[in-house]
Amino acid sequence: MWLVKNKKKIVILGSGFAAVECAKKLESEFGNDSEIELVMIGEDNFLLFTPMLPQVASGMIETRHIVFPIRTICKKTKFYEGRIKNVDPYGKLVTLWGTGDKRSISIHYDFLVVALGSETNFFGMADVEKNAYTMKTLNDAVMLRNRIIDMLEQAENETNPILRKSFLNFVVVGGGFAGIETAGELMDLLLDVRKYYPSIQKDDLKVIVLEAMGEILPGFNKKLAEFAKQKLKERGIDIQLKKAVTSFDGNEVTIKTLDETPKDSIDQSEINSIITKTLIWTAGITPVNTIKRSMFKTEKGKIIINDFLEVPKFPGVFAIGDCALFVDPITNRPFPPTAQIAEAQAKMAAKNLISLIKNSEKEKFVYHSKGQLAIIGKRTGIATFLGVNISGFLAWLIWRNVYLSKIPTFDKKTRVFLDWVIDLFFDRDVSRLNFIKRETEKEYKELDEVDDVW
């Protein structure tokens, strides 16, 4: 059996679920092996627990409670924080962008795991990209919460009815997991804090979900998806199906009704608009630009991989998670971009990498779903768990228990649990936190132009 004689370097690109799970599995095998060096490169020095992002946006969970420093959860892996400029699979080099404070560097690897995830897809609509809010990063959640509070503050004292309506209309684009859970949390927040704004009535608050398909939560059990739709409507959320966004200028979103039968020309009667200052875009994802401009063979921007999760023509290079294209042999469609699949691929990629180093047999990746879970509002959820379809309070309780158990550290488990308990007994905070750096020179200049008035 061939053994490693020289020190080999395994480099993992990314710091999301797939990257961290892969690193932990490799640490358990090679953590004390002086012949193997583990390296991780990520833009953020933390793992973000994305399933709870909507609860951060609604103010239920504190921001820092869903982030986990890489250096504390992958202690035997050397970490580089930086943006990846280029991956050269022929020279086996990963190059990082330089900054104003540090130079660009290149890192050599012997084995590579690409787990760079994805970014929001705006489908080429520059105005939407410029003006919409997203739900992908921790910053997105904080900015959205601030925006919601700001809109309530503006509407409270606004006398122009049209402008006031635009403040209180909140449009969520996308009826998948992210969109539906965001809409539910958003409505919960609005209803909870409305009492602090006397002039705003319940009927003034509008949360609208726009979905291009004919159903929400595609891929979920149809009966459960229908249950979710009805519950959301009972909460006052307007769900509009077969609606595609064509533009958003920051004041008005233009939408097109999608017909069953394609037409050569667009009937103007199918075009309408909604006045809103806040559009939340959760309608799709796309691989990061590093993948798109790489030398790897891609399809729809994703890296093509084989049954062992390896990149063809590049032995020892694996791709997992949202950036990899792996087709479900049953449906003949790519697997959805979920954390559950990313973690399953990460475990298999680590196992096959270990087999490759030890010159043993690799295994094909076969995915077995553990179920699906979604929260659709206060104390209500839907779940397919252990082959059983569940809805209502029990599904909500299962969601909380399952995701609480998946939080990597005990201290953060405790903090999130306490956040949930506090939310049961106390009101949500309506403070709007502004993190923009103070512009000192501009402020002093403006001050000099006026007399001191006290």
What is each of the regions a protein language model found here?
Residues 2-86, 170, 177-220, 454:
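Beta1-alpha1 glycine-rich phosphate/pyrophosphate-binding loop at the start
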